[in-house]
């Protein structure tokens, strides 16, 4: 079985992931909670929901 000879750096990993994320820009889905566009199978960046559960706190704008 193939095993990596050297560890991939964070920059290499994130660069590869960024290239793969561009594929989904044409297939954005609508968040059922807030109606914002989001990438499929990802947490909504606006409300923080995924599959009817709060995963992270929603974005808030500071009044000051």
Swiss-Prot record:
GO terms for molecular function: structural constituent of ribosome. It comes from the Bacteria. Residues 1-22 are annotated as: Disordered. SUPFAM superfamilies: Zn-binding ribosomal proteins. GO terms for cellular component: large ribosomal subunit. InterPro entries: Ribosomal_bL32, Ribosomal_bL32_bact, Ribosomal_zn-bd. Keywords: Ribonucleoprotein, Ribosomal protein. Residues 1-16 have a biased composition (Basic residues). GO terms for biological process: translation. Belongs to the bacterial ribosomal protein bL32 family. This is Large ribosomal subunit protein bL32. It comes from Brachyspira hyodysenteriae (strain ATCC 49526 / WA1). The lineage of its organism: Bacteria, Pseudomonadati, Spirochaetota, Spirochaetia, Brachyspirales.
